[in-house]
Amino acid sequence: MLKSIEHVHCIGDGCTVQNVYWVDVCEDALTLKGSSNTGAKFYVKGGAAKNGSDKIIQHNSAGTVYISDFYVEGSGKLYRACGNCNSGYQGKRAVEITNVTAKNVNVLAGINTNFGDYAKFTNVKYSGVHACARFTGNKNGKEPTKLGYSCDGSTSSCTCK
């Protein structure tokens, strides 16, 4: 189990993080950065995260993040596509969340509709959680504008764009 401000940084065209358990996440548990390859693939397989004050997975690179068989509890967001990066990759990001259970989490995924981001949910178990928060991202470092939520309710499978 890990405790610190930021935990794991994956730099480049992809990585696999398997069966890692984070507790008391302060800033981000996993940060993905350093790639402009739209075909980059990042995998989070198994594991869990608890007590994240903000987000668990921060996606600053291009590409797609695949989160599967994961448990998250007591956190702000499971996943956030960068909504105000003023350097590095600026463009479409995607996340596919499968077989995930969320408890006491504000939002499963935060995406930027103006960048073409999407979040796909399959067999996700949650209650009292917003599945997808949609934002208008920017490239100037300012806080992005929240547009609203989608995929809420008891639906365990949907796509948010």
Model segments located where?
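Extracellular beta-rich repeat passengers
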Residues: 1-2, 9-161
